[in-house]
């Protein structure tokens, strides 16, 4: 799999001088071995390639050269697809360089119920797999001009949640010109054949990686690290992770520690912080970070205070429970070497590029969500993603990745499974009813109408075994027909109006069916019932429900103000989801009743990032439910769902809906204005001095002008 280490001069590329200059202005004089091999395999001639290589090996520049070369020769549009919004933003900033030679670059994600007609004016579009999938369903004319696709992080095909969408997008994209980029995968030849692409596979890294396993010795407070080259090192300390962290810091390195849960990430960060007195920090830089934390509105006050106490010692934790704004500050501070240690959950390894000299993997086990009390070993791919963060180009001569085990007897097994083994082969994740039915609905929405043979042809283009396609295809057609999502006439399948609306809203057909049954079977209901119905769907958000909480939720079921729209299930798994949905509904009820964010976070034991994710998901689901109720002509429900959706979006009572239309006026400022007699747009315009006194001169003036603009638009 390794390539000859051949480096190519930038001047030897068959690209215009202005393109060469942009690359040189980044300080790049030579292409590294993976980049050189991609060029040799016809990257600049538009050849279809699958490039697999480790993190940090320069895959983005390969994509840039491929896109620019193709567009200069052929015109059209190029679409760069990533699995994460954070990566989309990162790539967008990189591609902005090409605007200096005339290419228009755009970024789009979220808001699935639109065709983004404005993108017709752009040449290079950066987006997510989900957003591109939703755009294809809307069939915008401009998308027909897209003739070059870059599929980034293609190993997400193996992700149980994201895999079906990545596969669906890939099936459509591989009918056009494409470049696929992936972390190292074991069955790359099979995937390349599926794509109709030539494989370019390499293990080359810009910084050599030393991998090892760390175990405790019988002698108290002594730990040995056995490295891949059979060398060993000993460290001493109260705790294995702390001991190796301090050892790395003493050599002026930065450290990423991975733990398997949020609580472990936070507690480990606190422990490490207690030992940071000897580490030299830039006090001015630390002070700037603390001021940044004070300036942002996102995030609970408790988590901010905890982070401030840690960051003052050069340490931070990082997990999905934190707000995006807090995570962004932590990541940027680490990149600039202001923070020395981050303790994170594995989600960080799959996200933005954030290398460190040393990576410590504190756990190879994680909780099994389906079986309480059980743990699973992490996949090899997850280990490779974490260890791949070790070694920062330009700063480190080597990167070190260490797995911590509890017993010396585990060393050999862990070494063989994670360090010496290939990652798991990529396999289709369309092999479930939920995934396959959604896939077919999306294909029909994008194509308009297809014969049975044509529709089946798309399914056969998946990675799913033909025998499984045959089983799922017949089931899917039958279920989608019986539930009025599709119709068949003259051996041609099309979507019903309801099916098309479901596809455009980008919700799962099982979600739509649950919503339809809940609404059609009941008269207009209360907020908690609507919220519970939507949270109970397959697209609903999941939250952790403790055993004590379960008992409280069961008691609450008896005291609700109205009848729920979902029948209480008998099966244990379904009942757990039923209680999960009730907790989500209660969180959202407090949110729309303007309960303070800190109170919500403490009451339900969630992070500010969790709350934001729940709000975004329920915003999408209330919006979808409103539009489905309109499609089904359930007017009693649609009136209530429209108001509920608006309240969920901003977290306000109905009386504030007019005020929160004003840019810069959120739930807190709207309540401040309302309680001081400013109850609508007209009041804002008629009382500018009072508004300025309440909000400050600068913001107040902007709010008055925006309110006047909105009033003019409405009249």
Curated annotation (Swiss-Prot):
Family in the record: Belongs to the helicase family. Hel308 subfamily.
What subunit structure does UniProt give? Monomer. Interacts with PINA ATPase which decreases both DNA helicase activities of this protein.
From the record, which residues define motif DEAH box?
Answer: 152-155
What is catalyzed by this enzyme?
Couples ATP hydrolysis with the unwinding of duplex DNA by translocating in the 3'-5' direction; ATP + H2O = ADP + phosphate + H(+); Couples ATP hydrolysis with the unwinding of duplex DNA at the replication fork by translocating in the 5'-3' direction. This creates two antiparallel DNA single strands (ssDNA). The leading ssDNA polymer is the template for DNA polymerase III holoenzyme which synthesizes a continuous strand
Tell me the GO molecular function terms: 3'-5' DNA helicase activity; ATP binding; ATP hydrolysis activity; DNA binding
Q: What is this protein called?
A: ATP-dependent DNA helicase Hel308
State what inhibits or activates this protein: PINA inhibits the (weak) 5'-3' but not the 3'-5' helicase activity of this protein on overhang substrates.
The record's note on what follows loss of this gene reads:
Essential, it cannot be disrupted.
